[in-house]
Amino acid sequence: MTEYLLLLIGTVLVNNFVLVKFLGLCPFMGVSKKLESAIGMGLATTFVLTLASVCSYLIETYILAPLGIEYLRTMSFILVIAVVVQFTEMVVHKTSPTLYRVLGIFLPLITTNCAVLGVALLNVTENHNFIESIIYGFGAAVGFSLVLILFSAMRERIAAADVPLPFKGASIAMITAGLMSLAFMGFTGLVKL
């Protein structure tokens, strides 16, 4: 039980996929302008990442490895992610049309979010079992959502601040992301996996 908790904390804080592994930067920069869309994107990504981790583990364990076709891993994981994203898009469209409109193009772009594919591939590479795969996927998603929500809240405050002209827009966003990454480096050594 303790190692599962350490895996979760390590994935959320110490080995954050956005700030440490630099995966998922496109939605991190693209959806973080408004807090509402960041929260929605975080929830959708959490659902997709967790479900994609489970599905990719099952496909790897029960189809690819027994048949000796591990070379199809990346292609099959991309297909699984696309199916999970389509399912998520249908669920969001039915349950919350407003959120569906707010997320716009970013919801289908979860398919190309490298963090989702990265989590699926790292689950296999690190030989996680079924429970560890779920925790790893959920932890990566929570870490992504945490960073996305914090960053969007900071960007909203920065938008209201008097920023010098050369730093407006993407420049101040990159500086802010760098400072967040430095802050998360403070968690290094908290959990050794």
Curated annotation (Swiss-Prot):
Biological role stated in the UniProt entry: Part of a membrane-bound complex that couples electron transfer with translocation of ions across the membrane.
Pfam families in the record: Rnf-Nqr (PF02508)
Oligomer and partners: The complex is composed of six subunits: RnfA, RnfB, RnfC, RnfD, RnfE and RnfG.
Membrane-spanning intervals of the chain: 5-25, 39-59, 63-83, 102-122, 134-154, 171-191
Compartment annotation: Cell inner membrane
InterPro entries: Ion_transpt_RnfA/RsxA, NqrDE/RnfAE, NqrDE/RnfAE_oxidrdctase
Keyword Cell membrane: yes
Identification of the protein by name: Ion-translocating oxidoreductase complex subunit A
Gene Ontology BP terms: electron transport chain
Family: Belongs to the NqrDE/RnfAE family.
GO cellular component: plasma membrane
PANTHER family: INTEGRAL MEMBRANE PROTEIN OF SOXR-REDUCING COMPLEX, ION-TRANSLOCATING OXIDOREDUCTASE COMPLEX SUBUNIT A
Enzyme category, top tier: translocase
